[in-house]
Amino acid sequence: MATKKAGGSSRNGRDSAGRRLGVKQSDGQYVIPGNIIVRQRGTKIHPGRNVGLGKDHTIFALIEGRVEFVTKRNHKVVNVKEIASA
C-alpha cells in the first residue's frame, strides 16, 4: 500500500512574457529618423506631425528633432518638432 496519496496534475501554471509595450522616448527627448517613440496595441496614442505608424501601431520618428506629446480633441497625439538649424 502506498503511504502517500498520488499528487494530482495541475492544468494551470503557464504565463506568457510581457510584451515590452509603452512610451520609449519621452517628451522633449531628441530623436533621429527611425527611432521608436511608442510601442502599443491599437492607437492609444495617435500619430501627429513628422511621425510614422507601423502595422503593429508602433509610432516612430520620420525626421530628426524633439518629441512632443499633446492632447487634441480628447486624443493623445505625438509629434516630432524639427530643431531649427543654427
From Swiss-Prot:
Keyword field: Ribonucleoprotein, Ribosomal protein
Q: For this chain's UniProt record, which GO biological process terms are given? A: translation
Recorded GO cellular component terms are: ribonucleoprotein complex; ribosome
Which Pfam families does the UniProt entry name for this protein? Ribosomal_L27 (PF01016)
* SUPFAM superfamilies recorded: Ribosomal L27 protein-like
Write the signal peptide boundaries: none
A molecular function annotated in GO for this UniProt entry is:
structural constituent of ribosome
Q: List the InterPro entries.
A: Ribosomal_bL27, Ribosomal_bL27_CS
Residues covered by region (Disordered): 1-26
Q: Which PANTHER family match?
A: LARGE RIBOSOMAL SUBUNIT PROTEIN BL27M (PTHR15893:SF0), RIBOSOMAL PROTEIN L27 (PTHR15893)
The record's similarity note reads: Belongs to the bacterial ribosomal protein bL27 family.
The name on file for this protein is Large ribosomal subunit protein bL27
The source organism is Rickettsia canadensis (strain McKiel)
Tell me the organism's taxonomic lineage: Bacteria, Pseudomonadati, Pseudomonadota, Alphaproteobacteria, Rickettsiales
Encoding gene (name): rpmA
